[in-house]
Amino acid sequence: MGKRLISQRRGRGTPTYRSASHRFKGKIKYRAYDSIESEGSLKGKVVDIMHDPGRTAPVARVKFENGEERLILAPEALMLNEEVECGVKARVKPGNSLPLSEIPEGTPIYNIENRPGDGGKLVRSSGTYASLITHDADKAVIELPSGELKALNPQCRATVGVVAGGGRREKPFLKAGKKYHALRAKGKKSVTVRGVAMNAVDHPHGGGNRQHPGRPTTVSRHAPPGRKVGSIAARRTGKRR
C-alpha cells in the first residue's frame, strides 16, 4: 500500500502542517465603536512595538486612557511613547483611526473596515496603503493598492498613514532555509516536489527508470483522495490551437 499524498496529510491537520498560532501576538481589531468614539476621541500611548511571526508588518501595543490595551498595525515613523487617538474627533495623523467620513480626501489610509464594526479587513500588509478618493453622506470611495475602486459605508473606520515594513519584497531571501522558515511560521509549503520525481510508493506518477507519469494524468472528479492528482475532471488537455 502506498503512502498518503501531501495534500491528504495537510488535510488531516497534524502539527507538521499547522501554523504555530501560539507564537502570534494576537488579533488586530478596532475597539467597539461606543459613545466615546462616536462623540469624541480616546487617546492612548504606544508602550511596545513588536515583530509578529504571523504578519508581514510590525505590531504596536497601545494602552488607552480608560485602561484598555489593544494591538494595532504600526504605521511608518511610529515611535515608542507616541500618542495615538481613535474616534470622530481624533486628529488626522498617522496612527490615528477615524471613520472615513471624517478623513480628508486624498489621505493615505490602511486597515479599513469592510463593514462598520468588523474591526478592519482591508490593506493590512507591510508597506501598503489605500487612498480615499471621495466621500459623501451615502458612500466613501477608496482606491486599493491594486488600483481597484471600492465603495464603502462612510461609517467604516480606517487608520491614517502607511503600514510600516515597506520594501519587504525588494529584499531577496538569498537562501532556501530563510524562505523555509518564513513560510513555516504561517504553516505554508516552502517547496513543491513533482510527482514524477517521487518513488512509486509516494505518488501515482512516481517510479520508473525515467521521469514520466506512466498513466493518463486526467482523473475523475469522483476519484478517491489517494488517486486524485494531475488534471482533475479536465474538459480538455494540451495546447490550445
From Swiss-Prot:
Region of interest: Disordered: 1-21, 200-241
UniProt entry keywords in alphabetical sequence: Ribonucleoprotein, Ribosomal protein, RNA-binding, rRNA-binding
Superkingdom of origin organism: Archaea
Biased composition regions of type Basic residues, renumbered to the chain: 1-12
Molecular function per GO: rRNA binding; structural constituent of ribosome
InterPro entries, sorted: NA-bd_OB-fold, Rib_uL2_dom2, Ribosomal_uL2, Ribosomal_uL2_arc_euk, Ribosomal_uL2_C, Ribosomal_uL2_dom3, Ribosomal_uL2_RNA-bd_dom, Translation_prot_SH3-like_sf
GO cellular component terms listed in the entry, alphabetical order: cytosolic large ribosomal subunit
Single Gene Ontology BP annotation: cytoplasmic translation
Keyword RNA-binding: yes
Keyword Protein biosynthesis on entry: no
Function: One of the primary rRNA binding proteins. Required for association of the 30S and 50S subunits to form the 70S ribosome, for tRNA binding and peptide bond formation. It has been suggested to have peptidyltransferase activity; this is somewhat controversial. Makes several contacts with the 16S rRNA in the 70S ribosome.
Record-linked PANTHER family: LARGE RIBOSOMAL SUBUNIT PROTEIN UL2, RIBOSOMAL PROTEIN L2
Subunit structure: Part of the 50S ribosomal subunit. Forms a bridge to the 30S subunit in the 70S ribosome.
NCBIfam families per record: PRK09612.1
Similarity comment: family membership: Belongs to the universal ribosomal protein uL2 family.
Protein name: Large ribosomal subunit protein uL2
Lineage summary: Archaea, Methanobacteriati, Methanobacteriota, Methanomada group, Methanobacteria
GN (gene name): rpl2
